[in-house]
């Protein structure tokens, strides 16, 4: 508990105006001295200060205000401040925000660059062919999602929500009937060897009558809940599929900057068997968001999404935009692509899963912020009715299936699995779905095998020789990592855990050429030669961007991503 007070005093989240926790110092000290964990009670505990979690918190407090009642609501965020771990494209569709805060356009918000043009390119190695754009971005905005959630956090606090950045929820709390009763943050001040350092502080229990998990894609607690309660099976039934998005924000030359310009591409540098594409979005202040998204069911274990992104930037049509510019920030994050077929039942005893932890991304739109926010709002409404009016959280699941989220994702359900048949068949099936069936086709395609099973043996492929970075347009990983402001306490237990420590050298390296050393966009995993001349896996956990790619793509599902000490990880400000 003293850690909580000390963190607040040190100004964690101070830039966003977050208040110090209102917990009793005397009682906290007594429990700390006795070795116990401080436990605080709220009506609702929200894990994750992203668009879904904050939309849920805001909606709850709005309902309380309208009903002249009150529910205590807290939001935990593992990043050092709100937005520090949030990364997205982002062309923002304001539909959910219009419902949540109808007069937002009259306020000073970071949502200020409307889409002005929308282009779609097919890239070959040296050419960019303009195709009809399949996107309808009229009325949408080019934004930094990390900036938007900071604004949302301030709106939540105005309504009385307590927002606590720098605290990582690491444990689900249950009662004797196996009903979730909240979460606990991890202990800090534990050394790599498991001993307690002088700075040791026990974690804090945040107990709630209702717990909403809004951890984002592949949330560690959410995945445990989904497995333990078989929520995938009681939902739409199919496994989730994923992609890895790698992004930079540049400051480009004034003459090349076109605020609101949106460009998407498909084709080069990815091969015809790999689903993915790139984006370039012009924000304000001469800023350009540029990124590459690669589906994680790719086959070639030698592929490096990071190096594919560096190669993409060297395309003549792309380089001409970047020349003379400067990189401001770098980051990476996985995203859900399973869509309608992969939606789990989001309700569990004592709470619900919202946002990208459940997986509401609309793949053909390349948008998930509006659906994440709406899911949080629906969960908040069900939570309010459950706690105040005696209803049931099943109302969230019922209303979700009646909402525009469900309609949107149903119409979009066949686009992603269409590309299981290859690039050209995927384009053809997508065109059929869009222009002929208009999302109402009489069939529903299934996803292929899970992403980790899609990785081929290395013997079926040749190593890929990527160009060396030039230091102007393309960069090595250490340079990019520095731009992510990633930082972790070095002397702490590893948060990247191997279920079987022999698998990397026994299976991954000889059979798959050590794919973790290729897919990780932060070079966390490296095979190094020991004094005996043997190759051993070395884990640079301090480099971790919290993207979750390893938790998804490892061929034998041997890597478990868990939360490190709160406040560690990337420090995004404009992503």
Curated annotation (Swiss-Prot):
Name of this protein: Electron transfer flavoprotein-ubiquinone oxidoreductase, mitochondrial
Entry GO CC: mitochondrial inner membrane
Catalytic activity of the protein: a ubiquinone + reduced [electron-transfer flavoprotein] = a ubiquinol + oxidized [electron-transfer flavoprotein] + H(+)
Residues binding a ubiquinone: 276-277
Keywords for this protein: Electron transport, FAD, Flavoprotein, Iron, Iron-sulfur, Membrane, Metal-binding, Mitochondrion, Mitochondrion inner membrane, Oxidoreductase, Transit peptide, Transport, Ubiquinone
Parts of the chain that traverse the membrane: none
Cofactor binding comment, as recorded: Binds 1 [4Fe-4S] cluster.
């Amino acid at each position: 508990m003293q850690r909580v007070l000390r963190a607040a005093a040190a100004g964690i989240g101070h830039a966003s105006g977050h208040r110090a926790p209102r917990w009793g110092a005397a009682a906290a000290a007594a429990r700390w001295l006795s070795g116990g964990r401080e436990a605080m009670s709220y009506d609702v505990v929200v894990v994750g200060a992203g668009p879904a979690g904050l939309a849920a918190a805001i909606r709850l407090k709005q309902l309380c205000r309208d009903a002249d009642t009150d529910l205590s609501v807290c939001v935990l965020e593992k990043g050092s401040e709100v937005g520090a771990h949030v990364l997205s494209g982002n062309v923002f569709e304001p539909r959910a925000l219009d419902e949540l805060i109808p007069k937002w356009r009259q306020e000073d918000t970071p949502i200020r660059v409307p889409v002005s043009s929308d282009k779609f390119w097919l890239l070959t190695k040296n050419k960019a062919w303009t195709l009809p754009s399949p996107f309808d971005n009229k009325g949408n905005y080019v934004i930094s999602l990390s900036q938007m959630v900071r604004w949302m956090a301030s709106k939540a606090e105005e309504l009385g929500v307590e927002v606590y950045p720098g605290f990582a929820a690491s444990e689900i709390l249950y009662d004797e009937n196996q009903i979730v009763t909240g979460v606990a943050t991890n202990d800090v001040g534990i050394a790599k060897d498991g001993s307690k350092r002088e700075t040791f502080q026990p974690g804090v229990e945040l107990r709630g009558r209702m717990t909403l998990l809004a951890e984002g894609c592949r949330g560690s607690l959410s995945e445990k809940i989904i497995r333990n309660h078989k929520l995938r099976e009681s939902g739409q039934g199919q496994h989730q599929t994923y992609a890895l998005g790698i992004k930079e924000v540049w400051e480009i030359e004034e003459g090349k900057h076109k605020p609101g310009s949106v460009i998407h591409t498909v084709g080069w540098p990815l091969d015809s068997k790999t689903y993915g594409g790139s984006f370039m979005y012009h924000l304000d202040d001469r800023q350009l968001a540029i990124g590459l998204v690669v589906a994680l069911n790719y086959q070639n274990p030698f592929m490096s999404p990071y190096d594919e992104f560096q190669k993409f930037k060297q395309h003549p049509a792309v380089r001409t935009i970047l020349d003379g510019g400067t990189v401001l920030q770098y980051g990476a994050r996985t995203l859900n692509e399973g869509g309608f077929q992969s939606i789990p039942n989001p309700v569990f005893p004592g709470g619900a899963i919202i946002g990208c932890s459940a997986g509401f991304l609309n793949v053909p739109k390349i948008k998930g912020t509006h659906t994440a926010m709406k899911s949080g709002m629906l969960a908040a409404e069900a939570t309010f009715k459950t706690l105040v009016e005696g209803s049931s959280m099943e109302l969230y699941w019922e209303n979700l299936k009646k909402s525009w989220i469900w309609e949107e994702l149903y119409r979009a359900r066949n686009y992603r699995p269409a590309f299981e048949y290859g690039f050209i068949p995927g384009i053809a099936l997508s065109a059929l779905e869009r222009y002929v069936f208009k999302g109402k086709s009489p069939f529903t395609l299934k996803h292929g095998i899970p992403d980790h099973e899609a990785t081929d043996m290395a013997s079926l492929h040749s190593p890929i020789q990527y160009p060396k970075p030039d230091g102007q347009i393309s960069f090595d990983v250490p340079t990019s990592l520095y731009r992510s402001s990633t930082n972790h306490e070095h002397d702490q237990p590893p948060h990247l855990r191997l279920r079987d420590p022999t698998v990397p050298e026994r299976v991954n390296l000889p059979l798959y050429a050590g794919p973790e050393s290729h897919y990780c966009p932060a070079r966390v995993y490296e095979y190094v030669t020991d004094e005996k001349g043997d190759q051993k896996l070395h884990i640079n956990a301090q480099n971790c961007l919290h993207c979750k790619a390893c938790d998804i793509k490892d061929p034998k599902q041997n890597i478990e991503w868990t939360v490190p000490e709160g406040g560690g990880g990337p420090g995004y400000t404009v992503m």
